[in-house]
Amino acid sequence: MNGTAVIQMLLNGSFTMIHERLDEMTDEEWSERALPGTSQLGFILWHCSRIIDWTVQCALQGVPELADRPEWRARFLQEACYGAGIPDAVADRVVASTNRTEVALYLGEVKAAVGEWFAHQTDQTLDAVPPMKANQAGRPGYLDPAVWAEVEDLNGLPMWQVLVRPCGAHIRRHMGEYDVLLGALRAGAVTPRA
């Protein structure tokens, strides 16, 4: 066993969990909010998809994200960045601007790109410390205080730690959140947002 194999398994699990939830939810559930003060269900899955793209492309490599491609720029609000540290109203507009089918297609493209990049990684390359803050500098909104505060603690860490936190632990936290909220919604515990 090696560390790279463990991280590959973690990444594959993250993609699978997000895809399963996108496939299993209904179009109506996409824009539902189960409880006051929580995100709409679609936003959680969009954010999880975006955070993986951001982590591998922008944070680690300093290259354009797949969300920067014309077909995704037209569908995803640029002011939403990758979904961290943004106002609730912007998060709600993200959900209104896209749908679960589009996000599933995007996630499939992200998975392919991440797989291609990861195939060239070794335990040694993943020990490198990326210039994460510098990689954000050319991106509108990415260094805004509220957005940067959400990821600042990753700056200065080796690539493997940056990968396992947003693309592993963070995804699993949001999957638990999503599952609880979807369960509440399906049980009829929906309440209007306060």
Functional labels for PLM-detected ranges:
Residues Q8-N12, W30-G85, A112-G115, A119, ...:
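Short, contiguous alpha-helical
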